[in-house]
Regions:
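Glycine-rich beta-strand-centered segment in the early N-terminal region that forms part
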Residues: 23-38, 50-90
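NAD(P)H dinucleotide-binding glycine-rich loop of Rossmann-like/cofactor-binding domains
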Residues: 86-151
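Glycine-rich NAD(P) Rossmann-fold beta1-alpha1 loop
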Residues: 128-129, 154-161, 220
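Adenosine-nucleotide cofactor-binding segment
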Residues: 168-223, 280
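Glycine-rich phosphate-binding loop and adjacent beta-alpha segment
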Residues: 222-289, 323-324
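C-terminal hydrophobic helical "lid"/dimerization subdomain
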Residues: 273-324
Length: 324
């Protein structure tokens, strides 16, 4: 089988497409013929070695994939069944989806929801799944379309762009924050009512004028601090990323004076029931147009170059990897 293999040499991560024997696949009760995978920000950190994502080498990256079960010892899945996977540490500490085959635990798989195929599932991928969990977090906090504008930071990335499309479809007024002017038309086509430059979020006071009913933040650091300072009374921020850094230079003021909620969103260890619910929502809530405008297709061998481009903020929307 062909696979993108990460190896470490003199402290550097080296990525190359290699032919591997299937016997080298890790333990698991379902072996999957992978048709599609994708490149997420975390994959880019792993492939470039820019983030301490991978501790054990050699490793096949790819934190999500979709394909067909080849063999299964799990009664919930049968040979020939379409399945998808996101999270569970796959592509980080268990060989992942950037290979023609993957072997995983049945507990980690989701049967392909009706209305999706492998390609569409990976246009959504970890990024879209995370975006849906963020939207559900805002709903759980009682944020409704009539409450006011929702701001999405890092809006041109995979999570942000899907969040814009979902929120727009659900009737919310969406304001997108992006550091790149070249993405503005794209974000408007997804449903953003207006777009703000990221440098407007560089500095903040402990409290600012109330602007946002809700927020989805993929950036962290000063951007998240500014968003918190601008939240309406009783508003909620769903935070799921650290593209701008992992620190948070904020104060307790938004929380104790404006009743603001900061809700963390993790997609890796999401329990199976919530996971299935999110995928059903994605099938129902993503407009059909999303699948045509939001994805670029690449091959396994192109993944390292595209990983660099993702780190350098040069890619908009989703990057699909055609594996088989």
């Amino acid at each position: 089988m062909q696979a993108l293999l990460l190896e470490q040499q003199d402290g550097k991560t080296l990525a190359s497409v290699q032919t591997l024997d299937e016997s080298r696949l890790p333990e698991g009760d379902v072996t999957v013929d992978v048709h599609w995978s994708s490149l997420n920000y975390k994959d880019a950190l792993a492939i470039t070695g820019k983030g301490k994502i991978i501790r054990n080498f050699p490793m096949i990256p790819g934190i999500d994939f979709a394909g067909t079960a080849r063999t299964s010892e799990d009664p919930r899945f049968h040979a020939g069944q379409e399945v998808l996977l996101t999270g569970w540490g796959v592509g980080e500490n268990h060989w992942g989806g950037l290979a023609e085959q993957a072997r995983v635990k049945g507990d980690w798989l989701v049967a392909m929801p009706q209305g999706l195929d492998a390609r569409k599932a990976m246009i959504i991928g970890t990024a879209g799944f995370t975006a849906m969990l963020c939207v559900m977090a805002l709903e759980d906090a009682g944020v409704r379309p009539q409450d006011g504008e929702i701001v999405v930071t890092g809006a041109s990335g995979g999570v942000g762009s899907t969040a814009v499309a979902l929120l727009h479809k659900l009737g919310y007024q969406v304001v997108a924050v992006s550091g790149r002017e070249s993405t503005h038309e794209y974000l408007k086509s997804l449903g953003a009512s207006r777009i703000l430059p990221r440098d407007e979020f560089a500095e903040s006071r402990p409290l600012e004028k109330q602007v946002w009913a809700g927020a989805i933040d993929t950036v962290g650091d000063k951007v998240l601090a500014k968003v918190l300072a601008q939240m309406n009374y009783g508003g909620c921020v769903a935070a799921c990323g650290l593209a701008g850094g992992f620190t948070l230079p904020t104060t307790v003021m938004p929380f104790i004076l404006r009743n603001v909620r900061l809700q963390g969103v993790d997609s890796v260890m999401t329990p199976p029931e919530r996971r299935a619910q999110a995928w059903q929502r994605l099938v129902a809530d993503l407009p059909e147009s999303f699948y045509t405008q939001a994805a670029k297709e690449i091959s396994l061998s192109e993944a390292p170059n595209f990983a660099e481009a993702i780190i350098n903020n040069q890619i908009q929307g989703r990057t699909l990897v055609k594996v088989n």
